[in-house]
Design a protein with these regions (language model features):
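A short acidic, glycine-rich active-site loop
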Residues: 77-90
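A conserved mid-domain beta-alpha-beta active-site/ligand-binding segment of alpha/beta enzyme cores
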Residues: 92-97
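Non-catalytic, C-terminal membrane-associated alpha-helical segments of glycosyltransferases
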Residues: 101-155
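A recurrent flexible, glycine/aromatic-enriched loop bordering the glycosyltransferase active site
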Residues: 2-22, 84
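A short, conserved alpha-helix in the catalytic core of glycosyltransferases
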Residues: 17, 23-28, 33-63
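Short glycine/serine- and small hydrophobic-enriched flexible loop segments
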Residues: 46-50, 98-101, 124
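Active-site donor/metal-binding and catalytic loop motifs
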Residues: 57-80
Length: 155
């Protein structure tokens, strides 16, 4: 779209999100139990379930890093993929499982994301190092998500 045009979105990232305080009062705060990952996505799903619509400004720019560095596989940069620490992968896996359990999260997103999660698990535990640590932390995240664990990781 043209610079400045708006379009509707399913969810937005917290960085650069502008929300009227009245909406925040009605929808509630971000879920701090999710700690690092998916707090924005969860809030957006909750807002949409209450009838709010989300919009983004086309071609707006915001300097923001979503990972340590781009992922390269067989010499090619994978667009939309970034290296993350094994601990960050833990939160990504745990929190997506926590979202799967919430009834206001759209079923279509859950199905699509489960496929994405399987691809991410395979890629980071088989192809992208540190493979063993990545796999271990992601398995712990899946397990803790299934158990309903929230907040920062604790041994």
């Amino acid at each position: 779209g043209q610079r400045g045009e708006t379009a509707e979105a399913d969810f937005l990232i917290t960085s650069g999100m502008l929300v009227p305080t009245g909406v925040f009062d009605r929808v509630g705060p971000f879920d701090e139990g999710l700690f690092i990952d998916s707090t924005d996505r969860e809030w957006c799903f909750r807002a949409r379930s209450m009838g709010y619509r989300l919009f983004f400004v086309a071609r707006a720019s915001l300097a923001h890093e979503l990972g340590d560095r781009p992922v390269r596989l067989f010499g090619r940069v994978l667009r939309g993929w970034a290296h993350h620490s094994p601990q960050r992968l833990y939160y990504m896996m745990r929190n997506r499982v926590l979202l799967y359990r919430r009834n206001y999260v759209p079923l279509g997103w859950k199905c699509h994301d489960a496929i994405r999660a399987a691809g991410k698990f395979f890629a980071f535990s088989v192809l992208i190092g540190p493979r063993l640590a990545n796999g271990r932390w992601m398995l712990m995240g899946l397990w803790d998500g299934r158990r309903g664990k929230t907040g920062p990781f604790a041994n």
